[in-house]
């Protein structure tokens, strides 16, 4: 059993009571919330937890964290659910040690995935080996939040310590990608699915930040320093320091020292290279930079994103540079901002033209203090579910019945998180 049905049912009833003015929200919330627990979570023989992303038979390190994060509220009172989340952290750390460059994994060593098309150092556990900085941030975030929200510490075992060392080592190596063993080439006509320069990636200069091959959308980076992911790395490196200092885990002294150094160098890189100006001359964060003077003004609808910087804990919502960046992102100056008959928001090179992502709409709501904006976005999300009663990867701004991904648990859970935020359940 992954959770106590009685405890979760009682909690859902409490949420429904607080949201009784919004029955449409409640209907979608309950469907999304229970679907993830009932249909994506599997407890394995070793007691760890595998979380299916949805309609793709694999687990993403990023998605699985976001899928279970909204359950931390209930995990405070449900020991079964608490162990399910701890089991996910254990599984994530085990898989990171199988290959820290992989973004998604199989439930067993079955060689399923992109093995016939991808030229990179694969093994049977890997579904896909697109290296994304945030894939290593998310498990650290979940381990920390589970501890702080519920007091659970069983996730901090020997595997966690070893995996944390591996993450710190990899991020240090990738501060100068010339020292990296990672290469990725896919047999494809879609340029976003492969790396240039025989799999090495685009040209860059050393900045102090850590290099990324792909974005959270699983599309390749145009420039190799992805600012939102480096922001996220700064945040979780702070978590690492708190975990190892307060719990006095094995090798605490060296891990704390390494994480402090890395955090300071990445933050300095952000301060020295991450800023650009928008069309109004305002100082904003670039989405990607290469250290050679090139920068992109855009955002990705996934998380981490520039829009999500306060949600990730990197900056305050009222930070001036963030607010200028936010206005720029949510405007036509962002080439992936689309406005239509039913909605406006962020799209992606990963999906069709004029398709926007519910995840980004949820993040827009989670990064404003304006209750009216939150309500507007929740109403919009429910109205644009394509008549399915759940969220999708993306939908057309002029016709929400046109959408991608029939079953996308991450989007479902981001909607749930925004509902809880609106109701002040944090």
Specify the residue positions occupied by each region the protein language model found:
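Low-complexity, Ser/Thr/Pro/Gly-enriched N-terminal "stalk/linker" regions
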Residues: 1-62
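Long, acidic, intrinsically disordered low-complexity segments
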Residues: 1-26, 80, 166-189, 314, ...
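Well-ordered alpha-helical scaffold segments within catalytic/enzyme domains
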Residues: 7-21, 66-79, 138-153, 231-251, ...
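Extended, well-ordered alpha-helical scaffold segments
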Residues: 28, 32, 79-95, 152-172, ...
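Active-site-adjacent bridging/hinge elements
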Residues: 36-46, 110-118, 203-215, 336, ...
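Aromatic-rich carbohydrate-recognition surfaces in CAZymes
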Residues: 57-85, 89-191, 409-425
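Extended ligand-binding clefts on enzyme/binding-domain cores
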Residues: 61, 97-101, 108, 120, ...
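C-terminal capping/lid segments that line or modulate ligand- or cofactor-binding pockets
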Residues: 118-124, 129-132, 296-316, 354-426
């Amino acid at each position: 059993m992954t959770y106590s049905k009685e405890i979760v049912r009682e909690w859902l009833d409490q949420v429904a009571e607080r949201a009784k003015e919004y029955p449409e929200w409640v209907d979608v919330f309950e469907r999304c919330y229970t679907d993830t627990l009932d249909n994506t979570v599997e407890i394995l023989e070793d007691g760890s937890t595998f979380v299916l992303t949805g309609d793709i038979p694999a687990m993403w390190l990023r998605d699985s964290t976001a899928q279970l994060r909204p359950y931390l509220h209930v995990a405070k009172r449900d020991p079964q659910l608490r162990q399910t989340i701890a089991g996910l952290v254990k599984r994530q750390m085990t898989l990171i040690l199988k290959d820290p460059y992989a973004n998604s994994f199989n439930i067993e060593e079955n060689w399923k995935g992109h093995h016939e098309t991808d030229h990179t150092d694969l093994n049977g556990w890997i579904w896909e080996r697109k290296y994304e900085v945030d894939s290593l941030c998310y498990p650290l975030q979940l381990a920390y939040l589970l501890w702080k929200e519920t007091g659970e510490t069983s996730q901090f075992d020997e595997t966690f310590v070893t995996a944390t060392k591996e993450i710190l080592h990899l991020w240090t190596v990738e501060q100068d990608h010339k020292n990296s063993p990672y290469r990725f080439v896919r047999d494809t006509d879609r340029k976003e699915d492969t790396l240039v320069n025989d799999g090495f990636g685009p040209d860059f200069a050393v900045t102090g930040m850590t290099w990324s091959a792909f974005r959270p959308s699983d599309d390749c980076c145009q420039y190799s320093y992805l600012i939102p992911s480096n922001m996220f790395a700064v945040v979780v490196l702070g978590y690492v320091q708190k975990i190892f200092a307060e719990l006095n885990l094995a090798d605490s002294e060296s891990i704390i020292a390494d994480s402090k150094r890395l955090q300071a160098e990445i933050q300095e890189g952000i301060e020295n290279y991450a800023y650009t100006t928008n069309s109004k001359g305002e100082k904003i964060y670039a989405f990607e930079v290469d250290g050679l003077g090139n920068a992109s003004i855009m955002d990705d609808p996934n998380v981490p994103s520039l829009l999500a910087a306060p949600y990730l804990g990197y900056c305050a919502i009222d930070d001036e540079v963030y607010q200028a960046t936010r206005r720029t992102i949510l405007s036509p100056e962002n080439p992936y901002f689309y406005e239509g008959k039913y909605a406006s928001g962020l799209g992606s090179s990963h999906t069709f033209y004029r398709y926007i992502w519910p995840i980004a709409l949820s993040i827009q709501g989670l990064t404003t203090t304006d209750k009216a904006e939150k309500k507007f976005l929740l109403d919009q999300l429910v109205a644009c579910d394509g008549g399915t009663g759940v969220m999708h990867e993306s939908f057309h701004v002029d016709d929400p019945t046109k959408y991608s991904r029939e079953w996308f648990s991450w989007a479902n859970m981001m909607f749930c998180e925004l509902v809880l935020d609106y109701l002040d359940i944090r």
